[in-house]
Amino acid sequence: MLARISAADDNGWVQCVSCGKKDHYKDMQGGHFIPKGHSSYWALKEENVHPQCPGCNMFGMRHGTASQAYTIWMQDYYGKDFVQNMLDSKGLPMKLYKKDYEDMLKDFRERIRHHEKRIGECRPTTNG
């Protein structure tokens, strides 16, 4: 959710990085540039997850057109060297401990709440 809501404008609209379709962030998905099953190192990194419409994320990536467009978007946004480094390092292991996950989750929740307030969709916080 963080990838979608942080990319949204103040009205909650976001653009698919593959096809350019605009929709509300709740109707989009977080598409992984390097698929989750291919890299434990990049699976939870923000640079690897960006808004995609369901068509591109679920079907387009399988047929090549969305993945090609995603690659071009990544190179334009981060630069070719960064993207090449991502691809070269996708086999690296990522060892996270329970505390790492807890800290990451806390950070993600805080940042999501910030963006919900920005968009005007603030939900009450829960303890825990």
PLM region descriptions:
Residues 14, 39-60:
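Short beta-strand-alpha-helix junction that forms the catalytic/metal-binding core
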Residues 20-27, 60-63:
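Cys/His-rich microdomains that often coordinate metals
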Residues 85-128:
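Short flanking/linker segments adjacent to small metal-binding domains or redox-active Cys/His motifs
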Residues 1-5, 33-39:
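Short Cys/His-rich Zn2+-coordinating modules
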Residues 1-15:
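Short, charged surface segments at domain edges that flank catalytic/cofactor-binding sites
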Residues 17, 30-33:
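Histidine-centered catalytic micro-motifs used for acid/base chemistry in nuclease
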Residues 20, 34, 57:
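Cys/His-coordinated zinc-binding microdomains
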